Amino acid sequence: MPFAEYFAAVWAGTSAELRGSAGSGVSGTLGDLLVLARELQAPTRLAKETLDEARAVQFPGLDGVLPGFGRQTPNDWGLGLEVRDAKSPHWTGARNSPRTFGHFGRSGTFLLVDPDAGIALACLTDRPFGDWAVDAWPRLADAVLMERGS
């Protein structure tokens, strides 16, 4: 199935649009991002096995650079989802569990899921990713977890 058809099937009923590359060309609303957050917590559109594979570390021990946060040893990733593990510094909060996973981008947007805390956190901004996010995002994630008592 061509990717555009797959995208349309998965995102049916939302305003999400594919405007270019799957890696950086998805546009949508906060509501659309929350649909994805719910799906990543309790899949109904994806097979549970697909989600399990997507959030599982694919190449254990592979080092790399986490944009804005520097070299990470290791820099674990699933299939399109970054896995927090023991990375430091990191864009999620210090209180987030190592099983936390998600993705962020140049648009200043992120989505994380912390399965141990039972939360998802989505953030949309009108500012491109930069130094401001390196400071603000971990503090936001920690504040949400503190508010929940996690």
Could you describe each region identified by the protein language model?
Residues 1-150:
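Catalytic loop of the DD-peptidase/beta-lactamase superfamily, centered on the K-T-G motif
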